[in-house]
Regions:
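Conserved C-terminal "switch" segment of AAA+ ATPases
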Residues: 6-64, 69-82, 165-175, 209-214
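Aromatic side chains
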Residues: 8, 20, 50, 92, ...
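Broad structural signal for hydrophobic residues in well-ordered alpha-helices, predominantly aliphatic
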Residues: 25, 89, 202-203
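Residues immediately C-terminal
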Residues: 2, 65, 223
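Conserved catalytic-core segments of large NTP-driven translation/proteostasis enzymes
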Residues: 39-144
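Peripheral, non-AAA+ core regions of ATP-driven protein-machinery
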Residues: 81, 102-103, 108-113, 121-260
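Walker A/P-loop NTP-binding motif of AAA+ ATPase domains
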Residues: 1-7, 228-229
Length: 260
C-alpha cells in the first residue's frame, strides 16, 4: 500500500525554519554568541523565493549558506553582529530564484486560472487562449505532457460538438485556428485536471466573453462535457487562497473531499 504525504505548506516551513533550522545553523556556524537572529520576514522570503520543494532539505541548506557568509563577516571582516534583512538578502543568496506572478486584476478574454498539483504542492496555472484566421488547427504550447495535450483536444472536440448551445459559430473551425498556452514554458506540465480550464479559455476566446480574474477551476473534461474528479484538492485550494482567488469551481465528484 502506498501512503501519500502532502508537502509542507509555506507557513509550516516557516515555523520549522524558525524553531529548528535557523537555530541549528546559527549554532553550527559558531554564531550563537554573536546574538545573530534571522527575522520571520527573512525566513519567509527564503522559503518563498529561494526554495521550491515538498520538504525542507533545500531550505536548511539555504539557511546554512546565509549563516556561513555571516560567519565569514564575523571572522574576516570583523563585523560582530551581521544584519540580514529582506533588503540585503540578495547579498547573501543572489537574486531570487522563484518569483510568483501577480494575479490579473481585471476580467480577461481567453484567460482562465487553472489549478495544478505538483510534487511541491498546489499551484495556480493560468491558461491563455487566442484565435486567428486559419483552418481549425489547435496549437498547444507551454511544455505540456501527452495527457494534458489530449485534454486540450478533448476540449476542442466538445466545443465543436456543442458550438450552437455555446453560442459559437458552428463553422468556426473552417476559418479559425486556436492557440492555447500555459505560461512558464520551461516548466513541464501534465495531467488531465486542466481540461475544464482549457475548455473555458477556448470558449472565452471564441465568444469574446470575459472570465473573472478572481475565479479558478480544476477538473478533467470528457467529450460529453462531464467534469471528472481530480486529486490534490487540498493543495490546490491552498494555492488558490494564497493567490488571492475568491471562488474555485471543482468537480461534483470532489464534494466529499471538502471536509478535509
Amino acid at each position: 500500500e502506498i501512503i501519500e504525504l502532502s508537502s509542507y505548506m509555506e507557513d509550516e516551513k516557516l515555523e520549522i525554519a524558525k524553531r529548528y533550522l535557523a537555530p541549528k545553523q546559527i549554532e553550527k556556524n559558531g554564531l550563537k554568541d554573536n546574538k545573530i537572529k534571522l527575522s520571520d520576514a527573512v525566513l519567509k522570503k527564503i522559503v518563498s523565493e529561494y526554495t521550491r520543494e515538498a520538504g525542507v532539505r533545500t531550505l536548511e541548506k539555504t539557511i546554512a549558506k546565509v549563516c556561513r557568509k555571516m560567519a565569514y563577516q564575523v571572522v574576516e571582516q570583523d563585523i560582530e553582529t551581521p544584519k540580514v534583512s529582506v533588503k540585503n538578502l540578495h547579498e547573501y543568496l543572489g537574486a531570487p530564484i522563484f518569483i510568483d506572478q501577480e494575479r490579473e486584476k481585471k476580467p480577461q478574454v481567453g484567460y482562465v486560472n487553472g489549478l495544478a498539483w505538483t510534487s511541491v504542492g498546489g499551484v495556480v496555472l493560468p491558461c491563455e487562449a487566442t484565435t486567428m484566421a486559419g483552418t481549425g488547427k489547435l496549437a498547444l504550447t507551454g511544455s505540456l505532457g501527452k495527457v494534458m495535450q489530449e485534454s486540450g483536444h478533448a476540449a476542442m472536440s466538445y466545443i465543436r460538438h456543442n458550438a450552437k448551445s455555446l453560442k459559437i459559430d458552428e463553422e468556426f473551425y473552417k476559418k479559425l485556428d486556436i492557440h492555447v498556452h500555459l505560461p512558464e514554458g520551461a516548466t513541464p506540465k501534465d495531467g488531465p485536471s486542466a481540461g475544464i480550464t482549457m475548455t473555458l479559455a477556448m470558449v472565452s476566446a471564441l465568444t469574446g466573453r470575459k472570465v473573472r480574474a478572481d475565479l479558478a477551476m480544476t477538473g478533467e473534461i470528457t467529450l460529453r462535457g462531464r467534469v471528472l474528479p481530480i486529486g490534490g484538492l487540498k493543495e490546490k485550494l491552498l494555492a488558490a487562497l494564497l493567490y488571492g482567488v475568491k471562488e474555485v469551481l471543482i468537480p461534483k465528484g470532489n464534494e466529499k473531499d471538502i471536509p478535509e
